[in-house]
């Protein structure tokens, strides 16, 4: 009977140890998380690309969102770390995230970042995307830079923004309205896109200064023939820096001409407010 009892105890210990081993989880931050963080300031998502902490030595952790501290997915092997505007930056492709925290619920917003690139040749390159689970584009808001044959030069860039899951509104910097500022001269430049729900207008900033004199089809955001009011992103999912929805595996068009950003990205910020001109200038002047 003692032998039988001892055997039962031994089996119980082995099962307990085995159960503990099976339930062991990887350390926090080992993989991208699949739930959202609710930030406490208007800055809802922020990727500085420059952590030098030993625990962030893996590239996906260096490229983490510093608000939630969650890493990105591992980027493609061609994505590298380069010298940025403050410390290090990302170069060469897309960086994908499970989400942008709760930024997709914003009613006013600001997208701000630093970029460095030459003129795309042959195909457009994507700047960023807030993907969606719906619509033929599978994206709520995205922006890209056209290639040389489409009119981009080192001094004036053809930039296009698409708002809405069914490409409801196109905001196209083309012809006489190409975006100035030497954005494609292979130097770092700061861009900010600011939407204010009280005016239903979007303001564009290049190197801390607002672009003025733009036609209404570049500034006025509409819905059903009237002002948009609060921004309305539909079923947002994930976020892609330097790519469209396809680069993050979120569906949408899969054509080969849809290319990731092949230059540099740094200090990528998403706010749930319309930053003022003074606040945008401060980001530029402080290299934030």
What feature does the model see in each segment?
Residues 15-19:
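C-terminal motif of bacterial Sec signal peptides marking the signal peptidase cleavage site
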Residues 215-263:
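Flexible glycan-contacting loops in extracellular carbohydrate-active proteins
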């Amino acid at each position: 009977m003692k032998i039988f009892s001892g055997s039962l105890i031994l089996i119980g210990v082995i099962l307990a140890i085995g159960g503990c081993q099976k339930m062991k989880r990887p350390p926090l931050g080992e993989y991208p998380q699949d739930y959202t963080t609710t930030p406490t300031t208007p800055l809802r998502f922020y990727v500085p690309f420059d952590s030098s902490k030993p625990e962030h030595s893996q590239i996906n952790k260096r490229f983490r969102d510093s608000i939630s501290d969650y890493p990105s997915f591992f980027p493609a092997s061609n994505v590298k770390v380069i010298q940025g505007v403050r410390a290090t930056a990302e170069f060469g492709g897309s960086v994908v995230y499970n989400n942008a925290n709760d930024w997709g619920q914003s009613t006013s917003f600001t997208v701000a970042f630093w970029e460095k690139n030459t003129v795309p040749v042959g195909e457009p390159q994507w700047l960023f995307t807030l993907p969606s689970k719906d619509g033929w584009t599978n994206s709520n808001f995205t922006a890209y830079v056209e290639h040389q044959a489409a009119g981009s030069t080192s001094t004036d860039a053809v930039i296009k923004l698409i708002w809405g899951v069914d490409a409801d509104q196109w905001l196209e910097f083309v012809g006489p309205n190409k975006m100035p500022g030497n954005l494609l001269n292979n130097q770092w430049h700061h861009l900010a896109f600011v939407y204010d729900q009280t005016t239903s207008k979007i303001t564009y900033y290049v190197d801390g200064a607002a672009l003025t004199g733009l036609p209404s089809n570049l500034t006025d955001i509409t819905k059903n023939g009237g002002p948009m009011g609060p921004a309305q992103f539909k079923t947002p999912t994930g976020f892609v820096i330097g790519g469209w929805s396809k680069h993050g595996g979120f569906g949408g068009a899969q054509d080969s001409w849809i290319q990731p950003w092949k230059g540099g990205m740094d200090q990528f910020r998403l706010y749930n407010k319309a930053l003022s001109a003074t606040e945008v200038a401060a980001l530029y002047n402080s290299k934030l």
